[in-house]
């Protein structure tokens, strides 16, 4: 249990028996609002709580007066060395140094398992991510969402969830018809015809490889086939080939999905119809007309009666159409059917990773899941923004009219998988990220992945060169008394809290920020040793101080390795 969690538990124990003006806290919903956290300014103490502010709403008493009462009670908590109150009623704590020294011992005993917490309790979570259209190999623009989804899955597994990684193959609809027509042209090209790639078709040269496969298997036989048979053959061969390319690209990123679900197979299994029938049974479908969509003013638009889902009953802005004018299902109908299929497989918690251009789908999908599951299932939709690819500050063109684009393979060959994975997590997922090819290979503190890996490598260099140290139970850690050493220990103690909040908010970038902060504090401490021999990790003729600092350094290594493991990044023991 982390220091913050320990103090929170003690505070709750005190509040359960405390009587203030005949008010005793027995309502757990009140305690759920209790915060024990680290202040932004370390001068305000090691931890703070909002307990007095919460209780003032129920006791109808000035929070400063309540805080003074609480201070008397909380002062007996053995881990607390100092306590004070600041307006409007926050209570700040300083924690005994012995508690922080115990953190070093705990980390060295648990090693990379330090900070592991289990609040998932084996609950199943479905994470759908990537789901790129199978119309071509993955370009580097897909990498951010792919890495985010994979690392989030790792993180949720770390905190005790059973995670299923799923990829939805969009192998039905207009884009597949365009793919078939584009491949057929390339097939004709292989046969020697001069072709013209029309507007709206896929121009990529990779399609010529599929044309060659078709020629090897069928010769010129496809030319004489009827349209439906030829379409089926080209479709099946193309999708198989392109999904193989996509899986290979994902493997280059270190990503492997557990399940691949086909949209066309769901249609064959009448999942859409079954989903619609369920909504009809729930009386959540009606026939009506919608207002003209925003942004279409001036366009020749005519209202028509159509099948609508009552999504506004579940928090959406408008009700949603399920059928097109020609009677075929809308994209939304297929989408909610897919989530109905997930629910039918027993998933009560789903996470969906989408590009930020899909922000309009958030409310409607949440509404659909709530309706289909009677509120028993939830979906968390995580949006990722674009990545600007730069080379020493200059924009890198992502695509050309020829259909060529910057591939995942290109980037990994240039900078390496681990660099790509780390850099993609250096910003909150819905914030635009700059990926500069020149900067991500710099060996400087301006390159976060180098900075973190260098800290880990420095730890191992130190261990390799250190003399034999004392057994940990024989070390007097009170010799670690400098401001920089205590700051680093307190930072390491936050690791469990960082893992927990990152998992609960589905924000793995918090771990990236934390690892950079740990590396920065460690490098700073190392730098002080370059200025003063007394601050070096290995101090001649002082085996106790050397041992204490080596165990502190090893703690840094274990925490960094633990974080990088969540990212599926190999921690380096030496820099090359």
From Swiss-Prot:
Belongs to the class-I aminoacyl-tRNA synthetase family. CDD domains: ArgRS_core (cd00671). A motif ('HIGH' region) lies at residues 132-142. Signal peptide: none annotated. The keyword ATP-binding applies. This is Arginine--tRNA ligase. It catalyses: tRNA(Arg) + L-arginine + ATP = L-arginyl-tRNA(Arg) + AMP + diphosphate. Its main location: cytoplasm. GO terms for biological process: arginyl-tRNA aminoacylation. InterPro entries: aa-tRNA-synth_I_CS, Arg-tRNA-ligase, Arg-tRNA-synth_N, Arg-tRNA-synth_N_sf, ArgRS_core, DALR_anticod-bd, Rossmann-like_a/b/a_fold, tRNAsynth_Ia_anticodon-bd. One of its GO terms (molecular function) is ATP binding. Its EC number is 6.1.1.19. It is found in: Cytoplasm. One of its GO terms (cellular component) is cytoplasm. It comes from Ehrlichia ruminantium (strain Gardel). It is an enzyme of class 6 (ligase). It comes from the Bacteria. Keywords: Aminoacyl-tRNA synthetase, ATP-binding, Cytoplasm, Ligase, Nucleotide-binding, Protein biosynthesis. The keyword Aminoacyl-tRNA synthetase applies. PROSITE patterns: AA_TRNA_LIGASE_I (PS00178). Monomer.
